[in-house]
Every structure is written in structure tokens, then in C-alpha cells.
Amino acid sequence: AGEMGDNLNFLDLPGSASAITAGDGFTCSIVDDSGTDKAFCWGLNDIGQLGIENTNNVGDGSGGSMSSINNVDLVYSSQPAVVQSIDAGEDHVCAIVQYGSYRPVQCWGNGADGRLGYGSQDNRGTGAGSTNGMGSNLGYVRLSSGTTGYYHVTDIEAGAGTTCVIM
């Protein structure tokens, strides 16, 4: 009793998942997509927590279809980031990304109380543009003064409305 057994559907992700994290009504995973580890998120997306520049939910159709899933747009100088680590809070997500030898943090979703670390309460990932967009519009979180505050993060943990890192 209470077991899902053979009745549980598998998600059709674009590659093998190496990590998974869940927030309130949504899930994100690091997926090997054609040899590059990228972030993919699905579920509730009312404040941009899926990082897809809109507020449309993903994967809420019948049969677990993921046909509308796209990777989170994390780039630097037109080069896609390699996602090293990812963690979801209640309604925001932060990831350690790798660009060459650098390992900065990028966050998206609910910006209330400064939980994303960008010095504002703006939500990120809700639409295209310099304030709430992804890709080249999504900067790194400044964790301390100088360049080392951007580039040498080793671990990350997101809570309901907070995010902590180890540098």
C-alpha cells in the first residue's frame, strides 16, 4: 500500500540528470545536454523560478510530457555556462556555473528581500530585458569586494527566502 510501482511515469528529459532540487511546486535538474551540463526546470512558474523569461508553467500537461521544456539561459559572452551545482529555495533558484576556471553564482525567481543577491528586490526570469531577463542580462551575484567574490564559489544552499554559499 502507498507504493507507486509501475504506475509512476518517467520524465522525458533531453539527457541524463546528475542532480535534482525542488522548490514549492517546481523542480530543477542538472542535465547532460549534448555534452554540456545545463539547468532544466519544470513545474510552477508564477515568479520566474523556471528561468525561461516568462511565467508559463512547464510540464503540467497529461502524461508527464516535457515537450515544452527549455534549458535555463545561463550564458557569458555568448558561451553557455556549465552548471556545477544547483539549489532551489521556496520560489527562487541559484546555481554555481563554470566559465573556464571561474565558478560564479547566478540566481533567478523571486527577488523579495534581496534573496537573489543582486542588490534589489526585482524578480529575475519573468521576461526578457535588462531588469528581469536571463542570458546576458543575468549577472553574477557579488559575494564580496574584488573579483574573487564572483568567481570562486564551492557550494551553495538555498532556503525558503535565503541563499548561502561557501567560497
Positions of predicted regions on the chain:
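Conserved core positions of repeat-based scaffolds
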Residues: 26-29, 41, 92-95, 107, ...
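A short helix->beta-strand "capping" segment at the edge of beta-propeller domains
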Residues: 4-12, 67-69, 135-140
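Short glycine/serine- and acidic-residue-enriched loop/turn motifs that recur at repeat junctions
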Residues: 1-4, 40-66, 106-135
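Residue-level signature of beta-propeller blades and closely related beta-rich strand-turn architectures
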Residues: 33-34, 45, 99-100, 111
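Short glycine-/Asp-/Thr-/Trp-enriched loop segments that recur within the blades
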Residues: 3, 14-16, 76-81, 144-152
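Disulfide-stabilized cysteine-rich extracellular repeat microdomains
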Residues: 9, 16, 25, 46-47, ...
